Amino acid sequence: MSPGLPVFQPPHAPDRSGRTRDRRFPAPAGLVALLAALAVLPPGAALAGPLGTEAPLGASPGRAPVAKPATPVQCAAPRPGRYVVMGDGVAQNEPVARILQETWHADGSISGIRLERRGQTYREVPYTGRYRSLSLCRAGIERSDDTRTSTSQAVLDAAGRPRYSLGTLPEVVVVSRWFPQRSSACSAALLDGSVLSMQQGRSWKNGQWRPNAVIQNERWRSGSVLGIAISSYGPSIEEATYSGTITVGADCLATVKEQDSLGAVYNYRAVVLADGSGYLYLQTDPDDLTVGYLEHQRARERAAPLP
């Protein structure tokens, strides 16, 4: 036995020799006071205090009270305008990534262009649709192109602009982020300066899609870029510098071509944000599927000015 340690004593077992089903225990003082208070309450009254919410009349004993309906939320109507939508997820067990540039018209109609990857297939197609107001600051959206119809719901900010949306068709798990898009024309000069990004994508290898992730730091000037990418492919980490070019149309649709220091070539379709806050791109190489928002430093400075 170690010096200074107390002698171990087994726990004392309570004496149950005289215990019967009729044995009575004294009620705690708090319970006695509660019962006394309830005895003098008028019918239908609720006891105020830290015991919780009032149980509605007719509630079954032992069940949790039913919450009262919340006060109706005052919401702005869905706001017409031009938007860019970046979506990523799975549809019918295939990875899906897309960028939409669309206009919400005042009559509730939608017109736009869809850049989309579905597995190893890329397509670019115009579409039309409708949007409508839903309760609790939401919008219902339906879009149709030459091959399919999709539906989704978006949550709206205080000004009625969609911020995030979710696909609502069966076997579709796709979430999207929205960006306001000015109606002004775009040019490559909007990207001049520093652009940072982080992305998660997928690579086709050995007959299956495997996850990857990358962070990037780019410097743009007059449509040309120099950058560094740090990538994770699971078993390995890769660092490479790269260079490339972007060709931008007045409609803000763009094409990006890049080559890195390891010899790999990358191809993207993109949408430049007309306010100069960056660009979104979608990879078109069949064995690599990445969609991402590449944020210009000026967007960060607008959100949180440097000291």
Regions inferred by a protein language model and the residue ranges of each:
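Mature soluble binding/inhibitory domains
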Residues: G49-P307
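General helical structural elements
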Residues: T20-P28, A67, R302-A304
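Sec/Tat signal peptide C-region and signal peptidase I cleavage site
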Residues: G44-L47
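Bacterial N-terminal signal peptides
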Residues: G30-P42
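N-terminal secretory signal peptides that target proteins for export/translocation
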Residues: M1-P26
